[in-house]
Curated annotation (Swiss-Prot):
The modification Phosphoserine is found at S84, S307, S337, S361, S442. Pfam families: ARS2 (PF04959), SERRATE_Ars2_N (PF12066). The modification Phosphotyrosine is found at Y82. GO terms for cellular component: nuclear body; nucleoplasm. It is found in: Nucleus. It comes from Drosophila virilis. This is Serrate RNA effector molecule homolog. Its main location: nucleus. Belongs to the ARS2 family.
Length: 963
């Protein structure tokens, strides 16, 4: 290494450089060390690689120098013989980036550790952390870059059999070793389950799963959601909505309409609210312009009659059209198009009153005015809409004034007629008010159909009030004329006139879009706004989030997902609001709040992009459709039985004749499991389902004609659709999607969908079918789909008492006895204390009696806690920390038991040395020098198994390896 360094310095050396630098005072000052020395040679002593500080950036020779040099980076080599240490030119290759992470280490890898002992130790500990019983890497260097991986919680590593033998006596027998190791593994599992239960028993998500009271309440709530969904589905099934749609991607609009209908019904909507689905969907950019447009429309409607908005409404009143443009349609029209098109409408309205010679001037004036308006509209702001709109109307040309004047002169007579009709309505209202304490509101004809509907509702209310007044006693009715004689009648008529005037003014104001919107309009209950919460601590409850969200108007519900171990048991949440709220403002205010010192990470949740998504088109084939019907029926029966949807008490009214079907039809099914379809279940979707499960084939015809199936397998056959089977399958698929939130063609379930922003959001449908399909493809598809849906076919069976006893189940009476003993303290002879109340007794039996009488609620809490823990153990899919990677790989392989259901271990027997290590030189050299028997010691018969050989082709032949 020294020769190469010298060669490097020789090539870079300048012959007279040292002499030039010696006569430059500034360079001499730079060459001096910080401590101040007379000669640059004073710093040579600092080049000792073992005298540097930990802050040095160099490698093995990292001394604390003011100006690092190339020699600082090349290790503890000899110092250069020529040249100055303060070289200006940078080195050819700098090694510092490789050592930059040394600041993150408690002990630097280089400098103080020339033999890399610490680095080897870190690497050993990270790969073999089983000896330290740690679930995280012990090295700061390895844990710093991988923060996400280090946060993943796992169980501590379980001792391997080899490590467990190190803790036992050397004279222990093999059977005793295996017995103790089995007990160790059982105790280890019990301890992990108990620790996990204690860590999460106070969290809401855990209580909703296993607490004896909270879990029952949660299950009843979910069952209520399912019953509500079932009622909605039956309603849609009866009115033909379900039967009129097919689950094909080509009918995406119809499927979306069915899903939206379900959502509106689930939200408590009526048939009137379903009319919102007939309106055209509002595009996103138009929705953002609605706010400025509505304010502008209200300003225009309150102006003088030269407003174009007013002329349009008066035009509708003049022509007595039964339908008026709805406010939604007006809001969908852009502002520019509204101002550009009103001149053409005025031309049509004022055509009889026009002068023939003014046509050209009107057109030219209108064109100029349009150009001016467009320029002004680009320059104005939203704050001065009123002033700019007024200025635009005042800048009309003379021809426009004549045109508008002619138009409004025609309409003045109509206004006079309307005033006369209004006066008649006032007189009629005054006459009716004499008999009614509440005067009815008289609608104006200018309001169109929207106002007529409102007037009809008010008239119905007045009729109801009249009926109530007619039912009053005769004494109260006799008092009314007496009161009228005393002078109350003129006061009442004056009040009625004032009220009718105010109502008439209100009716004229309802021409505005905002006023019309306040009338009875269909509600878009299927559209919501929502906020997504990225981080929710496990300790945060749903009630705390609801307390924050109820302060905002339009709050509907909140949904919280189950925690994930990958996210350190943090959860995600969705907050749902109505569509008309300012969701961004609410999201901003939520981001400025912290709940239990946790940033929720609120962001605006976008709407669903594609609600109907295509699945494989091969699903439309007749054979696959029949297999899907069978699978859907099994899934529906399993889920109905799990939630007890169609029990005898709930279904007696819905299907009274279900049991009257002959049992002989059960033999028509394929297999014994198909006999339960439509007979044991009261579900109308499963009625007569066995008729569609019978497979049909022309086997005899093919045999007689000699038609072989080889040609079909090679070339394939076209897709065969059976519309009758497809209609049955679609009814089952929609039942699973609407009632149980199971997307069949996506083979998944959407959990807690009733609390999500979209209650029926996404559905997968059959895509476009291929041209041909082979029988092999059909069989593979059916088999693969059956495997994907096994999670819905398997029944959830809880563990038995014997099984949970092995996991450490607790006995309620035993735990109560422990509770009594823990609260019985002996102070002195014949002097005992109860810590629960602080009272003293003469004996423990008195404390026991006192606890059961005065602290019965504490005893009940102990019993509930025991049931709480046992419910957690009974769940076969209970949440728990994942096993340590080392434990999961070596637990069964090195135990020597070889239980069924596991792969055969790939390691040698537990007493053999691992691969890659040489055997001990002495007989007793194994396992730390202890005197163990030879490596190939015999095991008892119950633990012996056949050894499986793994031969290396390059290794020499060893014939007696498995003797």
């Amino acid at each position: 290494m020294a020769d190469s360094d010298d060669e490097y310095d020789r090539k870079r050396r300048d012959k007279f450089r040292g002499e030039r630098d010696s006569y430059r005072p500034e360079r001499r000052d730079e060459r001096r060390p910080m401590g101040g020395g007379a000669n640059s040679r004073d710093e040579w002593s600092e080049r000792n690689p073992f005298r540097g500080s930990s802050a040095a950036g160099g490698g093995g020779g990292g001394g604390a120098r003011h100006r690092p040099d190339y020699s600082d980076y090349r290790g503890s080599g000899p110092r250069p013989r020529y040249g100055s240490p303060g070289r200006e030119m940078p080195p050819a290759k700098r090694m510092r980036p490789d050592w930059g992470e040394s600041e993150m280490r408690s002990n630097p890898r280089f400098g103080y550790d020339p033999y890399l002992v610490q680095a080897w130790n870190d690497h050993y500990q990270s790969l073999h952390s089983a000896y330290s019983h740690s679930s995280h890497p012990s090295s700061a260097r390895e844990s710093a870059p991988n923060v996400v991986n280090s946060d993943t919680q796992t169980q501590p590593a379980m001792l391997t059999l080899k490590q467990f033998l190190d803790t036992q006596d050397e004279n222990i027998s093999d059977s005793e070793v295996m017995r103790k190791y089995t007990e160790y593994k059982t105790d280890f599992k019990r301890q992990q389950l108990n620790e996990f239960f204690v860590a999460h028993k106070d969290e809401e998500w855990f209580k909703n799963k296993y607490h004896p009271e909270d879990s029952v309440r949660r299950s009843e709530e979910q069952r209520g959601f399912l019953k509500r969904r079932t009622d909605v589905f039956l309603e849609l099934l009866e009115n033909g909505t379900i039967g009129s749609v097919k689950v094909d991607s080509s009918q995406a609009d119809s499927l979306v309409r069915v899903l939206d209908t379900c959502v509106i019904k689930l939200e408590g909507g009526t048939d009137e609210d379903l009319k919102i689905l007939d309106e055209k969907p509002k595009e996103t950019p138009v929705v953002y312009e609605r706010k400025s447009e509505s304010t502008e429309a209200s300003v225009v409607a309150k102006r003088e009659p030269e407003s174009p908005k007013q002329t349009k409404s008066e035009k509708g009143a003049d022509e007595e059209q039964p339908v008026v443009v709805s406010p939604q349609r007006k809001s969908l029209r852009p502002v520019n198009s509204d101002e550009e098109n009103w001149d053409d409408e005025n031309d049509e309205m004022a055509a009889p009153a026009k002068v023939q010679g003014d046509d050209d001037s009107i057109k030219s004036g209108s064109d100029k005015k349009l150009k001016k308006k467009k320029i002004k509209k680009r320059n104005r702001n939203s704050s001065d809409d009123e002033s700019s709109s007024s200025s635009s109307f005042e800048s009309d040309s003379d021809s426009d004034d004549e045109k508008l004047k002619a138009k409004y002169d025609v309409e003045e007579g109509l206004r006079a007629d309307q005033k006369a009709e209004a006066q008649k309505d006032k007189e009629e209202a005054a006459t009716v008010a004499k008999a009614n304490p509440l005067p009815p509101d008289s609608p104006q004809p200018e309001g169109g159909t929207a106002l007529q509907d409102a007037a009809a509702i008010k008239s119905e209310q007045s009729d109801e009030q009249q009926e109530k007044d007619a039912e009053q006693p005769a004494e109260l009715q006799a008092d009314e004329p007496a009161a009228a004689k005393n002078g109350e009648e003129p006061e009442k008529t004056e009040k009625n006139e004032v009220e009718t005037k105010s109502t008439a003014d209100d009716v004229t104001e309802t021409i505005d879009l905002d006023k019309v919107k306040d009338g009875p309009q269909p509600r878009a209950l299927h559209r919501t706004s929502s906020i997504f919460l990225r981080n929710l601590a496990p300790s945060i409850t749903k009630a705390e989030i609801e307390a924050i969200c109820t302060r905002f108007s339009g709050y509907l519900r909140v949904a919280i997902a189950d925690p994930l171990v990958e996210r350190r048991w943090y959860r995600r949440g969705w907050i749902t609001f109505t569509r008309d709220v300012n969701i961004k403002e609410i999201c901003w205010s939520l981001n400025n709040q912290r709940l239990r010192d946790c940033e929720m990470g609120a962001i605006v949740n976008r709407d669903l992009s594609r609600r109907v998504r295509p699945a494989n088109g091969i699903t439309a084939h007749k054979q696959i459709v029949r297999a899907d019907i069978k699978l859907c029926a099994k899934i529906a029966m399993n889920l109905d039985e799990r939630f007890k949807l169609w029990s005898e008490a709930d279904s007696t009214q819905q299907q009274p004749d279900a049991e009257s079907k002959p049992s002989a039809d059960a033999t028509n099914g394929s297999g014994g499991s198909s006999t339960t379809y439509g007979f044991n279940s009261k579900n109308p979707v499963l009625q007569n389902i066995t008729d569609y499960l019978i497979e049909e084939a022309s086997a005899e015809e093919e045999e007689l004609l000699g038609l072989a199936g080889d040609n079909k397998d090679g070339e394939g056959e076209p897709i065969e659709r059976d519309e009758q089977l497809i209609s049955v399958l679609d009814r089952l698929v929609l039942y699973l999607r609407i009632v149980h939130s199971v997307d069949y063609y996506n083979h998944c379930e959407y959990p807690y969908e009733d609390e999500m922003p979209n209650r029926c959001g996404i559905i997968h449908a059959r895509g476009p079918p291929p041209m041909r399909v082979t029988s092999n493809d059909v069989q593979e598809y059916i088999k693969a789909y059956d495997g994907k849906l096994q999670q819905f076919l398997t029944k959830s069976v809880q563990l038995s008492d014997d099984e949970i006893k092995e996991l450490g189940a607790k006995n309620p009476e035993t735990e109560v006895e422990k509770f009594v003993q823990a609260n019985t303290q002996e102070l002195a002879k014949d002097k005992w204390l109860c810590p629960l109340s602080g009272k003293k007794f003469k004996g423990p039996e008195f404390i026991r009696k006192h606890i059961f009488n005065k602290h019965e609620e504490k005893v009940d809490e102990v019993r509930k806690e025991v049931q709480y823990f046992n419910n957690y153990l009974r769940d076969p899919k209970r949440p728990q920390l994942p096993e340590h990677p080392g434990s999961s790989k070596r637990t069964e392989s090195e135990s020597g038991r070889g239980s069924g259901g596991y792969r055969p271990p790939m390691y040698p027997p537990f007493s053999a040395m691992p691969y890659g290590f040489a055997p001990p030189m002495m007989g007793g050299g194994g396992r730390g020098g202890r005197n163990f028997p030879p490596v190939r010691r015999e095991m008892p018969l119950e633990h012996q198994r056949r050894l499986i050989g793994y031969h290396d082709l390059d290794a020499p032949v060893n014939s007696d390896m498995f003797d």
